[in-house]
Structure formats: C-alpha cells, structure tokens
Amino acid sequence: EMYLGGQGVGEATDKLLYGEVNPSGRLAETFPLRLEDNPSYLNFPGDGVNVDYAEGIYVGYRYYDARKMPVRWAFGHGLSYTEYEYSNLNMPAESLDDKGCVKVTVDVKNTGSMVGKEVVQLYVSDKNGTAGRPVKELKGFAKVELQPGETKTVEFALTARDLSFYHEGLGDWYAPSGTYEVLIGHASDEIALRGELSFKTEKQLPLYVSGATTIGELMAHPVTAPIIGGLMQNMQGAMGAMQSDPTENVEDTLGTGAEMMKAMMHGMPLKSLASFAGAEMAAQIELMIQGMNQALGNK
C-alpha cells in the first residue's frame, strides 16, 4: 500500500521492491477481511440524504478489538526486510496521579542484517471494567533507525490525560482510579510487552441519589459513604436483635461467605434495600435519599 506517494512514487516503489531501501511505513487504518466487517456497514450510505454515524468511538482497531474479529492487516502494521526485538519495558514510577507524569522506556534491537526503521507503538488499556471504553487505545509512537545488531532505548511519557476519556456529566477529562495496562507492540495486533500502572484521581463524578443508586456507588463517594455506612450499621444491629441465638453468625445462616455478601450488597440498589428492610426502614431510606442529595448540592 503506497497511498498517495506523489510524482516520484514509481521510483520509490522500485527501490523498495529491489531492496535498495528498507520499507518502514505503517498503516494508519485497519484493512478488514470483508466489506461487511466494517463498523459502518449497516449505516452507510444511509437513506440518500442522511447518514447515521452510529459507530461512536468504535472505529478502526477499537471496533475490531472489541469484536475480537480477525482482519487482513491491522492498524500499525508494516513490512520490513529486517526484524526487531523488544525488551526491558521499564516504568521507574509505577503509580500516577492527576498531576504526575510517568516515564516509559523500552529497548528495541535490530536482529536482522539490514539497516531499518521501526515504529514502536504504545497502547493503554483500562483494566477497571469502565463501561464504554475500548480494549486499548494508542497513546504514543516513535520511529527509530537501527543498524544491524544495534539496540536503542525508546522513551515515552504518560500523564493522566492519556488514561482519560471525556465525561459529559463532569465536563472534563476523567479516568477512574485503578489499574491500567501499558502495552508495547509492532502493531495493534502484535503486542510484545506489557506492564501495569496504578492510577489515583482526586476527581469526583457528579452523583444524583435515587432508588436505583447502588450501595457500592454511595460507598465510593466521600460525601455519601458516611451516611450509607451509618444506615448499614443500624440494619446490621436490627438483624442481630432478631436472631434467636445472639452468637449465631448471619453469614453462616445464609450459607455464604463475607466476600459474597459484600459483593451482593455492593450491587444492591437502595429501592431493593428498602423492600428488604421493611416499611419503617423504607421511610428512613427515603429521607436519607433526600438528605444525601442535599449534601451533594443537588436540587
């Protein structure tokens, strides 16, 4: 694929084919196996007047990664008359915050017999289960020329912005606290090295409390956590008083462990908690919802 090579494309192609020059270009798009594999296939060409661009962020490699779909040639793919080896992925600081910067270095070696240029690609993957995020995203690349047998160190810099997506409710770029994977590869489907990065943000997403809000969401917010925590303690005390044997463990009675109970409560919406707790507690929960929205500044 020579793309629009200009007036001298014929001579350039001749030099590449006969080995006078080592190719070092990379595809800036994905070549699918079939036309029907394109993410826009169902929406194009539209109704003759309007076209619905329904792919959202899932275009190119983001779409094929999410679908785990094989392709003809991947984003970032390129040919060479030599081969390259990656090693020593290093991040001196393995944690990052909103204002910090992490240096990422990797060694690249030309293991062939011809001088060449390699395009080192850095991708980032959100490992926190954040809804609506791609499997990975390109966040940096660098082209480096290497003599046969030569090794060079390539350096990247990652900031919070590289981990983030634009959050409409917040009106700002946002990345949740947690674990992110740093991937180094020859192309989007040829990942050679992986490393983990821990991120901590001070940004708080806007929260409006309703019956559909889960206990886990409330426990994760510094304003609502003390309020819901107090309610849970009151409920735990009430359940303990209802037991005929004060020494009996509620978890044993339910036949489950502490972790399973914690996971169940984490995903439980307040309206389910209200129905579980009885009429008196349901009224208390309704008042608590109003109080939490006031504390959050919601009207």
What are these regions (language model features)?
Residues 18-22, 224, 233:
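Sec-exported extracytoplasmic/periplasmic mature domains
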Residues 220-230:
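Thiotemplate assembly-line natural product biosynthesis machinery
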Residues 232-299:
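Extended, compositionally biased non-globular segments
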